[in-house]
Design a protein with these regions (language model features):
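Short beta-strand/turn micro-motifs composed of small residues
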Residues: 14, 133, 157, 245-246
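ATP/NTP phosphate-donor binding region
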Residues: 210-255
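Short, charged/polar "capping" segments at the starts of alpha-helices
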Residues: 20-21, 137-141, 248-255
Length: 255
């Protein structure tokens, strides 16, 4: 729906080694890369007085371009701004809820993760992140998952469709209401489904936790057993410690 799904992509960070190929693919798919002067015009259209311009939400890329006073092919699918700053002062770093995408370049995988971390921090913790990678690179996948404070971490999946569940995975419940956990100030960190709308009663009868004790291999008892027991434990069984159970009555009576 032209970026209106809250899980839709807002920014993409690309490794320098494949940046040119990714850019070519975007162009092939009908995206439009903004020129420097056009970039500034779209910046002023994305935010109005520091807040998202509601007029761009869910609009076509060409319509947004027209609002900004620039001309793009009418069939343009996404407006892409190549920017450097991931700071909140960069308009393209914000959630845009429209076919407008920020594109960043990173020299290393670690740098790409750092940029993504900052974008998540600025845009709001807990929502969704996506990683496109060779799935044999498990170490990188784990590093990305550990760094992202997002409740949905998608692999090789378009986030707008993948985040709402069912279409590209079977781990996320189909839903358009996506929980962001305590990171995002929500009570749940998963996709909200039927189970979250049901009141569940639990009848709990009293039960006691089971207790148990492990007894020693040998237990010595009867009057006068202590010297024999200590000798056997030390010389035959080579034990260095023992536990003696007694009380004043037993002690006074020679036990």
């Amino acid at each position: 729906d032209k970026g209106m799904i809250c899980a839709s992509e807002q920014s993409v960070t690309v490794l320098e080694s494949v940046y040119k190929k990714v850019k070519e693919e975007f162009l092939y798919r009908g995206c439009y890369f903004l020129k420097p002067d056009e970039l500034e015009k779209v910046r002023k259209t994305i935010l109005i007085n520091g807040a998202l311009n509601a007029k761009i939400v869910g609009q076509k890329a060409a319509t947004i371009a027209e609002m900004a006073g620039i001309a793009v092919p009418p069939e343009t699918k996404i407006l892409i701004g190549e920017v450097e700053s991931v700071d909140i002062s960069e308009e393209f770093a914000h959630e845009k809820l429209s076919p407008v995408l920020a594109m960043y370049k990173a020299k290393t995988f670690d740098e790409a993760i750092a940029k993504a971390e900052q974008l998540v921090a600025d845009g709001g913790y807990g929502h969704t992140s996506a990683l496109y990678i060779d799935t044999r690179e498990k170490e990188k996948m784990e590093k990305h998952a550990a760094a992202m404070k997002t409740c949905r971490i998608l692999i090789n999946t378009p986030s707008s469709q993948g985040g709402i569940g069912d279409l590209y995975n079977f781990k996320l419940v189909p839903s358009l209401t996506l929980g962001c956990g305590s990171w995002g100030g929500n009570s749940v960190s998963e996709n909200v489904g039927v189970k979250h709308l049901i009141n569940i009663k639990t009848v709990a009868e009293r039960r006691e936790n089971m207790l148990w004790i492990r007894t020693p291999e040998k237990v010595y008892f009867k009057k006068g057993c202590l010297p024999v027991a200590l000798d056997e434990l030390g010389t035959v069984m080579h034990k260095k410690r023992c536990f003696i159970v007694t009380d004043s009555f037993l002690y006074k009576n020679g036990y």
